[in-house]
Amino acid sequence: MNQTAINRADARTRFIFDDMPVRGLHVRLENVWQHIVKQKNYPAAIRCALGELLAAGVLLSGNLKNEGTLIVQVQGQGKLKMLVAEATSDRTVRATARWDETAEIADDESLGDLLGGNGVFVLTLQPKDGEPWQGVVPLEGGSIAQMLVNYMKRSEQLDTHIALSASDEAAGGLLVQRLPEEVLDEEAWEHVSTLARTLTAEELAELDAQHVLYRLFHETPPRVFEPETFESSCTCSRGKVSDMLLMLGGEEVGGVVAEQGSIEVDCDFCHSKYVFDETDVNALFGEDVVGVAKGLPRHTVQ
């Protein structure tokens, strides 16, 4: 293993085996993860699942071929309604969850139980240039990691091992995968994947890439590339909220403001608040939509 410094707190590290067609990615997010969990009072079981999904999003975004955003979601109909994590080609991330805050959730409650047994996994690619793409598959397997392995077997048809973990302090992930269109004997793949499976959840959350890769592969060390660091950053803005209000239409938005005096939109990720009063809404639509909702004659505004 080369001596590239790979102990950064919020980093994705690529590695490849020169003597066999196997590649891998390691992710450990510390400061980023701690910033995200401070945004809401997540129950322990949901916090753990969200951290795993965040690590998964950063792992999968390592395969983005173009600039854009990768969004991974887990949706259900139980106590947990949604987990969502985003990772961009600019190496920023954000994540959040929605759940029934009146429900009692045990610290060790399984993902399947949280989702009500009918969960789905949604992966969305939003390129900066081009059309978005989305894939949806049912939740199969008892964990986010197994769900992703099943998804990648279907979509890429490549042998893949994924491990995910999250604690209060950090979220971590490991992906090991056969290279496409390369011949690899089963014994070599079984050797690498078996070693990868010996990594514990505690080690994955606590250890940086250098220690993880030495712990697993010190007898057949991979070539390690320069780490890619990540930061927490929300992409919400007043302009995006304005676009959303325009999509809702003047009749609906004007009606809310006529009744309540203003309309307030909270960002689920960073909890920024965007308030639009009567003047703001009328200017946005270019006419007195609030007045119309109050029964006044329709007229434009400057």
UniProtKB/Swiss-Prot annotation:
Taxonomic path: Bacteria, Pseudomonadati, Pseudomonadota, Betaproteobacteria, Neisseriales
UniProt PTM: Under oxidizing conditions two disulfide bonds are formed involving the reactive cysteines. Under reducing conditions zinc is bound to the reactive cysteines and the protein is inactive.
Location in or out of the cell: Cytoplasm
Disulphide-bridged cysteine pairs: C234-C236, C267-C270
Superkingdom of the source species: Bacteria
HAMAP family in the record: HslO (MF_00117)
Zinc recorded as keyword: yes
Keyword field: Chaperone, Cytoplasm, Disulfide bond, Redox-active center, Zinc
GO annotation, biological process: protein refolding
GO molecular function: protein folding chaperone; unfolded protein binding
Organism: Neisseria gonorrhoeae (strain NCCP11945)
SUPFAM superfamilies named among the record's database cross-references: Hsp33 domain, HSP33 redox switch-like
The protein's name: 33 kDa chaperonin
GO cellular-component term (any): cytoplasm
Residues spanning the signal sequence: none
Homology family: Belongs to the HSP33 family.
Record function comment: Redox regulated molecular chaperone. Protects both thermally unfolding and oxidatively damaged proteins from irreversible aggregation. Plays an important role in the bacterial defense system toward oxidative stress.
Gene3D superfamilies (UniProt xref): helix hairpin bin, Hsp33 domain, HSP33 redox switch-like
